[in-house]
Design a protein with these regions (language model features):
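Conserved mid-domain beta->alpha element of the FAD-binding
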Residues: 89-109, 113, 243-244, 345, ...
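Conserved FAD-binding catalytic core of PHBH/FMO-like flavoproteins
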Residues: 162-163, 183-184, 188, 194-360
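Phosphate-coordination loops involved in phosphoryl transfer and adenosine-cofactor binding
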Residues: 84-86, 210
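Short, well-ordered alpha-helix to beta-strand connector turns
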Residues: 84, 107, 151-152, 204-205, ...
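Active-site-adjacent segment of FAD-dependent monooxygenases/related oxidoreductases
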Residues: 39-44, 116-200, 463, 477
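Conserved Rossmann-like nucleotide-cofactor binding loop
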Residues: 95, 118, 249
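C-terminal helical "tail/cap" subdomain of flavin- and related membrane-associated enzymes
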Residues: 2-11, 15, 22-34, 38-66, ...
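Short, solvent-exposed loop/turn segments at secondary-structure boundaries
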Residues: 122-126, 328-331, 399-403
Length: 485
């Protein structure tokens, strides 16, 4: 499928699975009859034993929509303001835009607010790797990512260039891979993914730019009244449901539960990121720059990770332990200081010094790494019409590559939850959106993401310790589970 097909295709939810991508398949008739016989015999015997257990429905992928939850349509569904709540999405990053797309496909009314004045107003991060969220992209109507790159090999080196670990499809199969293997990670820049999602909405005009959230007030039976600052003036807007998708320093979260309850937690290291066009290397070549290899180099303290960023550039991520004060100071000194520190620490095997030197300071950023304590669902129970997704709900370190993946899964899960909980005749307006949708959604989201937050925090210690130097063809994260640090 070409990019144009992604843009022009309209989608609506699959009538077979109601947009879930899976169906409950009834147990076979023989199994049901057996249960009926067993339960009659049990009741007749009048014993104190354990009663027979009814066979549960078997959940299967929906074949009608290839498990995406969507089917092609001549047009998007008509917005259903009668049955669905109007959703105010705060934050136009990946999670917020993904939620807007999922609402569009379901006829759920929404408005997407972003504090930035434009799409390119500030850096939206560098590259990311779609892991389990690759399948979720189908559920957002994106069947292919034109700017996505597929890696087939992952290599870990010592600073001298000795390979201590290697894994991936190329390693396993020892054959030349297809251009788009079915089961592999997809590397893409954050802005490219964000743009692909925005194109589903029709482009930049789908976002209310320049809207800085100042506060909100939940009103009994009247939803939520939000206050924004727009071009220096105050603006009041009403919504039935507010979703904070505004990142690790979420204004919605701060207003909802306060900054002191679950403050930012420093994880003891700094990350420096850069993008290097291959043409800047002026003819220097390396087999590690073949566009399908991800590699990292470690020494037990510093660690650099490099992956394809585009067909003609690579992204690198350098990290090392540092006090919070030192990390803040270095970050505030700006790109040139970050580059100098990075170059000083990475006089290692080729092509690392060459790439570091060839990366323009304008393409470098760096920041201390934070997360937060796992969110207790009880902190949200009194928020009748407000919830959080993505980094606003469960921020994590970047070392497991799960932040964007979890945000995409959150967005799709919430839209599906609204479709189910606010369906016609559900009487959600009487029960409230929390009881009808949010409590179940938040429980699933926080349970799913908890291990990702925990593993991402533990990876900080693992990847910057001597245990990472142990040889073995496995991901570095697995060593944390199977070996003592």
């Amino acid at each position: 499928m070409k990019k144009a097909e992604n843009e022009e295709a309209c989608w609506t939810i699959c009538p077979e699975c109601k947009g879930r991508g899976k169906i409950n398949q009834r147990s076979r008739k023989k199994v049901r009859l057996r249960y009926q016989i067993e339960i009659k015999e049990f009741e007749k015997a009048q014993t104190d034993g354990v009663a027979p257990v009814r066979a549960e429905s078997n959940i299967q992928p929906c074949l009608s929509c290839n498990a995406s939850g969507l089917i092609r349509s001549a047009s998007y569904p008509i917005v259903d303001t009668e049955n669905y709540p109007h959703v105010a999405i705060i934050g136009g990053g990946i999670g917020g835009v993904a939620l807007a797309v999922a609402c569009l496909h379901r006829g759920i009314p929404f408005t997407l607010y972003e504090r930035d004045n434009s799409f390119d107003a500030r850096s939206q991060g560098y590259g990311l790797t779609l892991q389990q969220a690759s399948n979720a992209m189908k559920g957002l109507g994106i069947l292919t990512l034109e700017q996505g790159l597929y890696s087939t090999n992952h290599v870990v080196h010592t600073t001298e260039g000795t390979v201590i670990s290697e894994w991936g499809m190329r390693k396993r199969m020892h054959t030349e891979m297809k251009a788009n293997p079915k089961r592999t990670n997809v590397h893409i820049s954050r802005q490219s993914l964000r743009l692909a999602l925005l194109e589903q909405l029709g482009g930049f005009d789908a976002v209310q730019w320049g809207h800085q959230l100042i506060g909100f007030n939940e009103r009994a039976s009247e939803g939520v009244e939000l206050s924004f600052q727009v071009n220096g003036e105050m603006k009041s807007i009403k919504a039935d449901l507010v979703v904070g998708a505004d990142g690790i320093r979420s204004a919605v979260r701060s207003l909802l539960i306060g900054d002191d309850v679950t403050p930012l937690r420093y994880l003891g290291c700094i990350v420096i990121l850069g993008i290097c066009p291959l043409e800047n290397l002026k003819g220097f070549d390396s087999h590690l720059l073949d566009g399908a290899t991800v590699f990292q180099t470690v020494n037990g303290n510093e660690r650099i990770y490099m992956m394809p960023y585009s067909t003609d550039s690579v992204m690198w991520q350098l990290s090392f332990p540092m006090s919070e004060k030192e990390a803040k100071d270095l970050s505030e000194q700006g790109p040139q200081a970050l580059k100098e520190e990075g170059c000083r620490r990475t006089q290692w095997h080729d092509p690392i010094p060459q790439i570091m030197a060839a990366t323009l300071a304008a393409q470098i950023t760096g920041y201390p790494v934070y997360d937060r304590e796992l969110l207790d669902p009880k902190l949200l129970k009194n928020a009748r019409c407000v919830t959080l997704i993505g980094d606003a709900a469960h921020p994590m370190s970047p070392f497991k590559g799960q932040g964007a993946n979890q945000a995409l899964l959150d967005a799709l899960a919430l839209a599906r939850g609204i479709t189910k909980g606010c369906r016609p005749l559900s009487q959600w307006k009487d029960a409230g959106v929390r009881q009808s949708v949010l409590t179940e959604f938040e429980s699933e989201m926080l349970e799913r993401s908890a291990s990702k937050v925990k593993d991402s925090a533990e990876a900080v210690e693992l990847l910057h310790s001597k245990v990472v130097l142990r040889e073995g063809n496995e991901t570095r994260g697995r060593g944390l589970k199977s070996k003592d640090i």
